[in-house]
Amino acid sequence: EYQSAQLMAEKGVNVPMGIAAKSVAEAVAAAAKIGDDEVVIKSQILAGGRGLGTFKNGFQGGVHVIKTSQVEEYAGKMLGQTLVTKQSGPEGKPVDTLLLAKKMQLVNEMYFAIMLDRATLGPMIIACSEGGTSIEDLAASSPEKIIKVPISIGEGITDAMTLPLM
């Protein structure tokens, strides 16, 4: 997530302030640099459903909105631990990086991803206008709300491909 935000920011996309941290001390420093009373602390793993996940140490949730004074405690419970989500499988994924992000007041939350699709053996844009917290559940209950656009490796993303996303 933090790598994607960095790439988008480099291309002029407005993204919330976020700082990656690989230690508790770095997490505390990141929260101080953000400078707000509250921050969002997010486990960085290659699996979705982090907010609803459970760490093998019993700690609940891989994404939290917390007071800056709680960063040391939460980072200590998350870093170096294994997070189990619906997408990770029962073995889970180790958390070696956290993203500390500025808390935003959301007016509208959307989901957008580019993933490798097994069916088409290529990249696929996945988008939804109804947020991304439980995208898997939404896809199961209302699949018509999920927009899927296959990307040709030869052509890349064209203007025509983006029309369904508007």
Predicted regions and their residues:
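Active-site nucleotide/adenylate-binding loops and adjacent lid/helix of ATP-dependent enzymes
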Residues: 1-166
